[in-house]
């Protein structure tokens, strides 16, 4: 996560040892966009842990047989104070938002949306929109923005080639 604070506070990170153990968070199935929608495996938030650092949501979807499930069809909805990254492994999704962005994301690409003081967006990866679409597979991670920028400017960025 980018730290956009002008004067960030220094802090000491505790050193973990093997004695500290490892917490395994099991994902749960959640319908994305309603009860008859595509299912995602949501790891965060969970009953035992709502955050890991700045990460507040972690969803994995697919591989999903789009013809059987209808694919991803998330109607317009608002976000504030967070940033989302969508990384697609298989299929196509169309992102639309109130900033005027309309961007198709393909495998290996990223969409980065900064909600700031508020943005409304939708995501669609259906056979209706992409008739040749067979499967959909990807992840979406959300981070809580730092207090200094949480109500700042909104933005959308598409990364067509992710450096490896």
Q: How would you describe each model-predicted region?
A:
Residues 85-107, 120-122:
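A short beta-strand-loop-beta hairpin characteristic of the jelly-roll/cupin
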Residues 115-148:
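Ligand-binding loop in jelly-roll beta-barrel domains
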Residues 44-46, 126-132, 163-164:
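A generic local secondary-structure boundary/capping motif
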Residues 2-43:
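Hydrophobic alpha-helical membrane-insertion signals
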Residues 137, 144-164:
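Conserved, well-structured core segments that form or line functional sites
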Residues 72-74, 99-101, 124-131:
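Catalytic micro-motifs at enzyme active sites that drive phosphoryl/nucleotidyl and oxygen chemistry
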Residues 31-89, 138:
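A short glycine-rich, His/Asp/Glu-containing loop-to-beta-strand
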Residues 78-93, 112, 142-147:
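Short, conserved beta-strand element in jelly-roll/cupin
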């Amino acid at each position: 996560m980018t730290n956009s604070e002008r004067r960030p506070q220094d802090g000491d990170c505790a050193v973990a040892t093997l004695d500290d153990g490892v917490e395994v968070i099991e994902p749960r199935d959640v319908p994305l966009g309603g009860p008859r929608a595509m299912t995602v495996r949501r790891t965060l938030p969970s009953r035992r842990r709502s955050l890991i650092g700045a990460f507040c949501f972690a969803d994995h979807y697919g591989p999903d047989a789009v013809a059987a499930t209808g694919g991803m069809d998330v109607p317009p909805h608002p976000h504030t104070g967070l940033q989302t990254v969508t990384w697609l492994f298989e299929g196509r999704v169309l992102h639309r938002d109130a900033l005027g962005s309309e961007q198709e994301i393909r495998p290996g690409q990223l969409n980065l949306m900064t909600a700031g003081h508020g943005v409304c967006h939708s995501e669609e990866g259906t056979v209706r929109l992409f008739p040749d679409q067979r499967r959909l597979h990807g992840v979406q991670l959300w981070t809580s923005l730092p207090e200094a920028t949480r109500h700042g400017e909104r933005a959308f960025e598409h990364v067509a080639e992710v450096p490896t």
